[in-house]
Amino acid sequence: METLYNGTLTLGGKDQESTGFAWWAGNARLINLSGRLLGAHVAHAGLIVFWAGAMNLFEVAHFVPEKPMYEQGLILLPHLATLGYGVGPGGEIIDTFPYFVSGVLHLISSAVLGFGGVYHSLIGPETLEETFPFFGYVWKDKNKMTNILGAHLIILGIGAWLLVWKALYFGGVYDTWAPGGGDVRIITNPTTNPSVIFGYLLKSPFGGDGWIVSVDNMEDIIGGHIYIGTINILGGLWHVFTQPWAWTRRAFVWSGEAYLSYSLAAISVMGFVACCMSWFNNTAYPSEFYGPTGPEASQSQAFTFLVRDQRLGANVASAQGPTGLGKYLMRSPTGEIIFGGETMRFWDFRGPWLEPLRGPNGLDLNKLKNDIQPWQERRAAEYMTHAPLGSLNSVGGVATEINATNFVSPRSWLATSHFCLGFFFFVAHLWHAGRARAAAAGFEKGIDRFNEPTLSLRPLD
């Protein structure tokens, strides 16, 4: 009897007998069929772009301009808004037509990719080496593999430069730090000082250092893309025009599964970095679109109650809380004036709504008494009730469920999904790296079990 698992099932003319892989091994059946593998990749790209376009239009159709983006479960429109499309002062969405255009362009692109995927999967040549040698390859051809690596790096570099051109010449990008509560602006002076850009890479990832996640201005972000785009393009050209050195030929495993494992490791790292960026960073991920960070929501609550009680006559500089520490304000271990209460743990938070109230030694008491602007109060009150937490209780000094809004923050979605995906990709890297190394060593089929003692034991029944 034929089942899905006995190896006799044939899908697309590829069965376990002819390929060495069962149907559920997917593209492994196409390892040596470059034309069919091209079809799988193009079709996969079509699915990705189709999702982007369809989800984009879905978000546009459900978008309510009167509510904050982060309260509506949106994850794509915030990215478009961050690029400066359809946004006005203070992060207000004034035009959704660019978002509609983006969705339609992605859908049209996905149709082209989908057609290409179907064509190369079913109609085009099974292998490209004979008919299109430029696009053909053999996995063990080290020079060809580094040529392909170089082409990918060049395309990534161009992608980084597209953001630079958008920021410098094509309308600018949204800057949450623009005076008055954020605005779209042209980045006229991107950071090109290598000590600043590479200084982020040399920072500790812990505490207040934060590695590259600590970037806090658009000049550094765009300058970083100038560097990474240029390095990618130059590195791509290097890999296209050179051949691997002897030590790299010896050090790496040169097979399709090995390249898959390397790619999975790289995308795993990107997933973990994206997790941290989307959770902690409020410059690359402006809070106007993604909602406040955890520390930001906590500091917002302290600020909101300071404003309220100060209006009611409280002396916010000297009032004590139940622990004897300052109720509204206190000093950090280094002597800076910070917010008191549970939010003291987030004393090093930086946000565009709070920074104007700082002085040379932390929060400026005179500014807190005389210079608080209405937009700062409104934003803090909004952020206070939109902490990116799943907890219904007061955690870290943020609003309890009585005061909070019942929603899931885009930061929660993005950080959690990218952490999980990053983890799974890392496990997949270990799996495929182990298989690739085993195959290179000649024992990928596992240990011979013919003499396994278990096989000679009497059956239990």
Swiss-Prot record:
For this chain's record, the cofactor binding note is: Binds multiple chlorophylls and provides some of the ligands for the Ca-4Mn-5O cluster of the oxygen-evolving complex. It may also provide a ligand for a Cl- that is required for oxygen evolution. PSII binds additional chlorophylls, carotenoids and specific lipids.
- Record's bilayer topology term: Multi-pass membrane protein
Query: What Pfam families does this protein map onto?
Result: PSII
- Membrane-spanning intervals of the chain: 57-81, 122-143, 166-188, 243-263, 279-300, 435-459
* Record propeptide residues: 1-2
Please name the GO terms of the biological process aspect recorded for this protein, alphabetically.
photosynthetic electron transport in photosystem II
GO CC terms, sorted: chloroplast thylakoid membrane; photosystem II
| GO MF annotation: an example | metal ion binding
Q: Which Gene3D superfamilies match?
A: photosystem ii from thermosynechococcus elongatus
| PTM sites of type N-acetylthreonine | 3
- Any idea where this protein resides? Plastid, Chloroplast thylakoid membrane
**Which residues are recorded with the post-translational modification Phosphothreonine?**
3
Binding site residues for [CaMn4O5] cluster = 355
Keywords for the protein's UniProt record, in alphabetical order: Acetylation, Chlorophyll, Chloroplast, Chromophore, Manganese, Membrane, Metal-binding, Phosphoprotein, Photosynthesis, Photosystem II, Plastid, Thylakoid, Transmembrane, Transmembrane helix
InterPro entries named in the record: PS_antenna-like, PS_II_antenna-like_sf, PSII_PsbC, PSII_PsbC_sf
The record's subunit annotation is: PSII is composed of 1 copy each of membrane proteins PsbA, PsbB, PsbC, PsbD, PsbE, PsbF, PsbH, PsbI, PsbJ, PsbK, PsbL, PsbM, PsbT, PsbX, PsbY, PsbZ, Psb30/Ycf12, at least 3 peripheral proteins of the oxygen-evolving complex and a large number of cofactors. It forms dimeric complexes.
Query: In which family does this protein belong, per the annotation?
Result: Belongs to the PsbB/PsbC family. PsbC subfamily.
Return the HAMAP family for the record.
PSII_PsbC_CP43 (MF_01496)
Q: What does this protein do?
A: One of the components of the core complex of photosystem II (PSII). It binds chlorophyll and helps catalyze the primary light-induced photochemical processes of PSII. PSII is a light-driven water:plastoquinone oxidoreductase, using light energy to abstract electrons from H(2)O, generating O(2) and a proton gradient subsequently used for ATP formation.
Q: What is this protein called?
A: Photosystem II CP43 reaction center protein
Q: Which gene encodes it?
A: psbC
